[in-house]
Swiss-Prot record:
This is Methylmalonyl-CoA mutase small subunit. Keywords: Cobalamin, Cobalt, Isomerase. The gene is mutA. Residues 1-11 have a biased composition (Polar residues). InterPro entries: Cbl-dep_enz_cat, Cobalamin-bd_sf, Me-malonyl-CoA_mutase_sm_su_N, MeMalonylCoA_mutase_a/b_cat, MMCoA_mutase_b. Pathway: Metabolic intermediate metabolism; propanoyl-CoA degradation; succinyl-CoA from propanoyl-CoA: step 3/3. It comes from the Bacteria. Residues 1-34 are annotated as: Disordered. Belongs to the methylmalonyl-CoA mutase family. Catalyzes the isomerization of succinyl-CoA to methylmalonyl-CoA during synthesis of propionate from tricarboxylic acid-cycle intermediates.
Amino acid sequence: MSSTDQGTNPADTDDLTPTTLSLAGDFPKATEEQWEREVEKVLNRGRPPEKQLTFAECLKRLTVHTVDGIDIVPMYRPKDAPKKLGYPGVAPFTRGTTVRNGDMDAWDVRALHEDPDEKFTRKAILEGLERGVTSLLLRVDPDAIAPEHLDEVLSDVLLEMTKVEVFSRYDQGAAAEALVSVYERSDKPAKDLALNLGLDPIAFAALQGTEPDLTVLGDWVRRLAKFSPDSRAVTIDANIYHNAGAGDVAELAWALATGAEYVRALVEQGFTATEAFDTINFRVTATHDQFLTIARLRALREAWARIGEVFGVDEDKRGARQNAITSWRDVTREDPYVNILRGSIATFSASVGGAESITTLPFTQALGLPEDDFPLRIARNTGIVLAEEVNIGRVNDPAGGSYYVESLTRSLADAAWKEFQEVEKLGGMSKAVMTEHVTKVLDACNAERAKRLANRKQPITAVSEFPMIGARSIETKPFPAAPARKGLAWHRDSEVFEQLMDRSTSVSERPKVFLACLGTRRDFGGREGFSSPVWHIAGIDTPQVEGGTTAEIVEAFKKSGAQVADLCSSAKVYAQQGLEVAKALKAAGAKALYLSGAFKEFGDDAAEAEKLIDGRLFMGMDVVDTLSSTLDILGVAK
């Protein structure tokens, strides 16, 4: 059939050449000044003329700050990004240490195992490897896998196909010795076997409250020489500091400072700086904040490459290899299935950030050890889905070129470099750990984070926001008792709220706060919807009455069995009925009375209401203080 028969005139083919389509081409180009004026209009709407904000003041109000002082502005522009983006796989490695070639296995799905039951762990390891796991992370400790059981738990593993990494919180030497011994007994050629010993004597000392001993590093590196060049003796574990409360800047800076000190130590022990770089890996944290995680991984590679340049390391050896592990500090005990979402975001962030291996913690990590394969399956499948279905692994540095991510990478790198230099002035990371420097930085971060958690500027879904009393949990095995440590204390972010919940569940009947909802649902619905979840954070039940006379409200209060009440309504109803109901509830025996709203909404009765009412519920309130004091009033033991 001819082209004419098919309906296409050969003379018209020139009209089919592709053209660039500009989606915004029909609109006038907006200047930055016009954008700024529009921002001013929005933020000044309703403000009196004498209180109008300038653009700089508007920007300040819209800017947020991380716990360690990184500014995040509402909009980034071309001038905020570097002029040259660079390329993945080449110095300074900001965009990736390696080049992803389109294969789906762009990173190792590295499964964590720490169950001391060697038979359970052996079976779990085999099931994981048969179902998508590509490498292993084993905790070898008195409360985890015993060194003498390592041979058994790895007995089904094809060591020539599976990299194994160990780490320990109590005896790194014993863990390393146990792993090397397993590999030395293998009948496979040593050069085909890759293993990571997970040594980090500085982080170990910080965790245990002891003095770092770097003198053994060289011996371990030499012992690994017979194995695959992919083997590593050192894993700088920034996760140790993250779990103790470090922000992104400190976690990054202290990893760099630790690495620099290890390079110096290994050079003194007879290695070149390039050989030292070859034996160092990083373990970094992936959190619920995807952009900070992506930027931190990128910034670490860039800064580590700069350190390599100073040490004279071969350019192609300066890339930082990173094992990202999802944040233990982010994991919650209440409503644990929400942790699957947190783990998904963190794993996504690590993959976009260019981690070579990713460990997704089981969503039960705050409850106990997995009782069966289900939590382990969800953890490994998170990475597999992202790699094989979402296809992130087919893309090199997908966040590269983003004005926001590029600017955030630069901000983190600059701030971390400044802290790195402070540590260097102290004499290195060993000195920083042994002095008060690390604890002072951690105390500042933890204090700021505690404020944000308490006022919910840093909300925790299903815990401090949208809590569900009696949410479905999952059966786990209890964690074995761990030996005491004298070093850095670890705390999950949700612990402060879980302590409140524990107080409520420790009594035979849940404590109650009566919601006195005045007027119609149109009047009280918004306040009731805000206040009820606040009380539920601590596991406090909220019986309520919807409208009615003062006498009916008091009668409902008495029947509820509550000893504390919370007024919920609109300004209009507060002005009409609020004071009367407040007085009646106090007369009926309310030990404490709260107001959802503002005292000024009582109109002429505002001053009297403020004297009568014990506290308020409002956006930005310290929910931890209010809930704790309410439980005190109700006589619930701490």
